[in-house]
Amino acid sequence: MPDSTVQQPITDDTELRRKNRATVEQYMRTKGQDRLRRHELFTEDGSGGLWTTDTGAPIVISGKAKLAEHAVWSLKCFPDWEWYNVKVFETDDPNHIWVECDGHGKILFPGYPEGYYENHFLHSFELQDGKVKRNREFMNVFQQLRALGIPVPHIKREGIPA
């Protein structure tokens, strides 16, 4: 009697994981003028942005053309920015990678004095076949306020055993 069991193809995510991780690592090590080409790591409809802001609403830049424009702005405002202490974490989903890192450099926002900005960051990368579909950046917005010389309120947390 013939075997009527349908064989399911074996899927191996190893190559996809390698490709996606290489993209994330390239994104995180990109510095200087090379940042003007970082949008090439994204899908055509890809997005990136800052999910922790002073308004509470994310700043999202969508599409390769807008990401290219954002790179010009970013290089002007953060001319010597670099990520360091980069740790890459793969997840159960080969298309989702998290990064924990630190970043530092000059901050040159119009209307504020030149400052030096340091912060700790988390990045969520959602990928599609080795290209970034969505990058979300999370950081402590108070550190950016301090770097711009903006007074930060103090929260009284009485009773916390620290």
From Swiss-Prot:
GO biological process: antibiotic biosynthetic process
Coiled-coil residue spans: none
Keyword field contains Cytoplasm: no
InterPro entries reported for this sequence: NTF2-like_dom_sf, PhzA_PhzB
Keywords for the protein's UniProt record, in alphabetical order: Antibiotic biosynthesis, Virulence
Gene3D superfamilies xref list: 3.10.450.50
Entry similarity comment: Belongs to the PhzA/PhzB family.
Its job: Involved in the biosynthesis of the antibiotic, phenazine, a nitrogen-containing heterocyclic molecule having important roles in virulence, competition and biological control.
This protein's name: Phenazine biosynthesis protein PhzB
Organism: Pseudomonas fluorescens
Gene responsible for this protein: phzB
